[in-house]
C-alpha cells in the first residue's frame, strides 16, 4: 500500500517537485522588485522553486523593464549617493525581501535550502581583499541567514571564499568552468569551514555554500571549435559537468568512497557544498530546450534556471537521476575532444576570462542605466 501511495504521489507531482524527489533543488535565475510586489515569486515557490540567484545582468534587466525602482532612485539620489551606492541599496532591498519570502523554506529544510544569492561587484574579480570587504558589507547589510554572497572562482576569489566561509558567511562560488577550478572551490569551502569549526564561533551546520558550474557556455565554445556537424557538438558541456559531479562525490560523499577531509565536518552536521548547475538555458535552438536540466539531475545538486527554461521544463521536461550514470561515456567524450585537437583547458580558461568581462560589462551597463533613469526622473 505504501508503494502504491508513493507512486500516486509522484505521479501527481509537477516536474519541479519530481526534481526534488531526485535530490535536486530548482532555483530561479531571476529576481526583480516587480516579481516581489506582484506575487509572481510566491507563485514560483508554490510550484516548488526553493531559491533564487541574481547577477548584474538580471538587475540591469529589472531596472530596464520596470518603474518600480523609480521612487527609491530619486530618494537615494537626493541623499547624495553615487550610482554604485544606489545600486547596492536597491539590490540589498530586493535580496532581503526575497530572503524573507524564502525564509519558511530555509527553516523547514534545516538551513539546507531557501537561499537567495547576491554577487559582489564584478570589478573585484581579481582582488581578494576587496572581495572579502565587499562580501562582509553585503552580508551585514542584508542581515539574513538564508543569503549567499556570490564570489567568482578566480585565482583571487578562491582565498576570499576560504576566508568568508571561516567567518560563517554563506558563499555561492560562481563562474566555475573547469574541474580544477571546481576542486579548488570545494577545498576552499572545506578549509574555511574547518577554521570556522575550530574557532568556536558557531556550528558548521549553519554555514552553506554552492559551487556554480557553468554548462551551456562550454558547449557554445566547444561547438565553435569543432568541425561543423561533429558528433561531439552539444555533448561536452554535460560531460564536463558530470565529471565535476564525480569530483564532488570523490570529495564529499563517503558512501561512494570519498569524503576524506570533509568527514570530520560531516560528523558535526556540516552541509556538503552542493554543485549548482548554472548557464542551463540552451543557447543553440537545435538542442532540446531542457537538456541541461534533464541530463544533470541527481542527488545533492541545484539547478538555477531562467524563467523561459523553467516554463519549458515544467511543460515537457523529463526529470530523472541521469546525473548518476554515464561517467565512462563522459570520459570518452572528453578524450575524443582532445584527440580532435580541442583543449578543454584552453576553452575553460577563456570562458572564465570572458565570464568576468561579461559580468563587468553588465555592471557598467547597469550603472549607466541608473544615470539615464535619474536624468529623466529629476
Each PLM stretch: what is its role?
Residues 48-50, 143, 160-171, 206:
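Glycine-enriched alpha-helix->loop->beta-strand junction motifs that scaffold or abut catalytic
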Residues 35, 127-133, 151-165, 178-192:
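Active-site-adjacent beta->alpha loops and helix N-cap segments on the catalytic face
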Residues 270-377:
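Flexible, acidic glycine-rich loops studded with aromatic residues
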Residues 169-308:
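Catalytic alpha/beta core domains of metabolic enzymes, predominantly
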Residues 29, 145-154, 169-181:
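Catalytic beta/alpha-barrel core
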Residues 55, 118, 149, 164, ...:
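Conserved, mostly hydrophobic/aromatic
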Residues 58-60, 65-160:
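Active-site beta->alpha loop and helix N-cap motifs at the rims of alpha/beta catalytic domains
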Residues 2-39:
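N- or domain-start disorder-to-order transition segments that initiate the globular core
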Amino acid at each position: 500500500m505504501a508503494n502504491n501511495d508513493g507512486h500516486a504521489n509522484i505521479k501527481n507531482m509537477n516536474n519541479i517537485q519530481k526534481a526534488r524527489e531526485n535530490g535536486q533543488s530548482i532555483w530561479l535565475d531571476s529576481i526583480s522588485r516587480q516579481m516581489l510586489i506582484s506575487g509572481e515569486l510566491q507563485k514560483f515557490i508554490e510550484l516548488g522553486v526553493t531559491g533564487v540567484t541574481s547577477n548584474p545582468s538580471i538587475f540591469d534587466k529589472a531596472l530596464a523593464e520596470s518603474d518600480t525602482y523609480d521612487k527609491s532612485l530619486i530618494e537615494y539620489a537626493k541623499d547624495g549617493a553615487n550610482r554604485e551606492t544606489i545600486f547596492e541599496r536597491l539590490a540589498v532591498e530586493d535580496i532581503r525581501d526575497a530572503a524573507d519570502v524564502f525564509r519558511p523554506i530555509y527553516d523547514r529544510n534545516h538551513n539546507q535550502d531557501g537561499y537567495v544569492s547576491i554577487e559582489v561587484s564584478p570589478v573585484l574579480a581579481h582582488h581578494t581583499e576587496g572581495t572579502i570587504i565587499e562580501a562582509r558589507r553585503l552580508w551585514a547589510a542584508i542581515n539574513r541567514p538564508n543569503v549567499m554572497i556570490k564570489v567568482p572562482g578566480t585565482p583571487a576569489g578562491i582565498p576570499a571564499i576560504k576566508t568568508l566561509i571561516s567567518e560563517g558567511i554563506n558563499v555561492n562560488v560562481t563562474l566555475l568552468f573547469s574541474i580544477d577550478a571546481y576542486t579548488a572551490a570545494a577545498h576552499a569551502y572545506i578549509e574555511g569551514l574547518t577554521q570556522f569549526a575550530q574557532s568556536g564561533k558557531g556550528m558548521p551546520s549553519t554555514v552553506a555554500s554552492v559551487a556554480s558550474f557553468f554548462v551551456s557556455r562550454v558547449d557554445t565554445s566547444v561547438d565553435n571549435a569543432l568541425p561543423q556537424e561533429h558528433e561531439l557538438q552539444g555533448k561536452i558541456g554535460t560531460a564536463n559537468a558530470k565529471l565535476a559531479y564525480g569530483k564532488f562525490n570523490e570529495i564529499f560523499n563517503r558512501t561512494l568512497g570519498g569524503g576524506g577531509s570533509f568527514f570530520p565536518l560531516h560528523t558535526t552536521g556540516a552541509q556538503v557544498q552542493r554543485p549548482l548547475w548554472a548557464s542551463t538555458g540552451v543557447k543553440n535552438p537545435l538542442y532540446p530546450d531542457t537538456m541541461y536540466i534533464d541530463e544533470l539531475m541527481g542527488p545533492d545538486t541545484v539547478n538555477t534556471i531562467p524563467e523561459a527554461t523553467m516554463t519549458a521544463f515544467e511543460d515537457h521536461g523529463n526529470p530523472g537521476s541521469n546525473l548518476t550514470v554515464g561517467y565512462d561515456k563522459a570520459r570518452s567524450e572528453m578524450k575524443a575532444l582532445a584527440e580532435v585537437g580541442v583543449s578543454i583547458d584552453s576553452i575553460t580558461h577563456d570562458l572564465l576570462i570572458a565570464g568576468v568581462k561579461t559580468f563587468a560589462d553588465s555592471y557598467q551597463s547597469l550603472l549607466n542605466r541608473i544615470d539615464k533613469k535619474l536624468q529623466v526622473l529629476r
